[in-house]
């Protein structure tokens, strides 16, 4: 970390969640998972899960000044799959999936179903999957267990590397400031699993979505489209989802920034069928 040699004592890291719509980590499929794109493939070589030739010569786009996310995601996914096939479960891995099962199992299942449905939003899935019918989910798990295990493996690798990074930063006197986006994405495991905590009706459609009033960015305001929280439902649940989210973030960062202030200071509750804020 070169920041250590410039006497910098804090490093602010933008949202580290998986990217979703428009390659944005602020429309993430999970409020808890880590972004597979941040996994260092060379560390997988050191673990014997990949060979150097697997990585060398890869083409990630023609313009080095921009990121071709489509190519990067495709290449990374292919290499992570290859590493997964070489991976042998060990004590550390089993401890991780047990400790993180409270969010990891839902996320891995969500991503496996999403993959099976050509990455379409969960709102377009078959009714039994949308409404999480236990017998249908159990059958899917049995049939697609390897896909579910793959997503567990990816998260294990992300968090293993992240923890090493944080330990190294802290050892060098650098604290990490990390983001928590104020809203969850509609197309996320969080909303799919916990629709009653959001402004979602009985047909699993959003009723009110997030945005802000007109400002110098837009004369019609900003319409973000994230479902709002049902704070009454959150209160009845003891704010468990939010407390778990903050507790999880505090294990990854030294300080947490909720992004951003305007989103909960002057937010709008916008009808879901509106075209502007």
Map each language-model feature to its residues.
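Single conserved hydrophobic/aromatic residue that forms the stacking wall/gate
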Residues: 2-9
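Structural preference for beta-strand elements that scaffold enzyme active sites
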Residues: 10, 173-177, 255-257
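Conserved, mostly hydrophobic/aromatic
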Residues: 13, 110, 169, 179, ...
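Alpha-amylase-like alpha-glycosidases and glucanotransferases acting on alpha-linked glucans and related
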Residues: 22-159, 184-277
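Conserved, well-ordered alpha-helix/loop/beta-strand core segments that scaffold catalytic motifs
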Residues: 151, 155-184
């Amino acid at each position: 970390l070169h920041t250590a040699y410039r006497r910098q004592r804090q490093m602010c890291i933008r949202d580290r969640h998986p990217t979703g719509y428009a390659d944005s980590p602020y429309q993430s499929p999970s409020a808890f998972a880590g972004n597979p794109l941040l996994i260092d493939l060379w560390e997988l070589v050191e673990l014997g899960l990949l060979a150097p030739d697997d990585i060398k010569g890869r083409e990630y786009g023609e313009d080095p000044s921009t990121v071709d996310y489509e190519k990067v995601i495709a290449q990374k996914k292919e290499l992570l799959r290859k590493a997964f096939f070489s991976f042998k479960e060990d004590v550390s891995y089993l401890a991780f999936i047990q400790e993180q099962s409270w969010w990891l199992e839902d996320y891995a299942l969500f991503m496996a179903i999403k993959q099976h449905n050509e990455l379409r939003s969960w709102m377009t899935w078959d009714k039994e999957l949308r409404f999480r019918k236990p017998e249908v989910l159990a059958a899917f798990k049995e049939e697609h267990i390897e896909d579910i295990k793959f997503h567990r493996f990816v998260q294990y690798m992300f968090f293993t590397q992240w923890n090493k990074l944080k330990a190294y930063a802290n050892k060098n006197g650098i604290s990490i400031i990390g983001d928590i986006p104020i809203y969850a994405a509609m197309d996320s495991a969080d909303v799919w699993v916990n629709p009653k905590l959001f402004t979602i009706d009985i047909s699993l459609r959003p009723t009110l979505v997030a945005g802000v009033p007109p400002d110098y960015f837009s004369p019609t305001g900003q319409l973000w489209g994230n479902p709002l929280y049902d704070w009454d439902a959150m209160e009845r649940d003891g704010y468990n989802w939010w407390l778990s989210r903050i507790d999880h973030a505090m294990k990854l960062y030294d300080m947490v920034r909720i992004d951003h202030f305007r989103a909960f200071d002057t937010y709008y509750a916008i009808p879901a069928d509106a075209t502007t804020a």
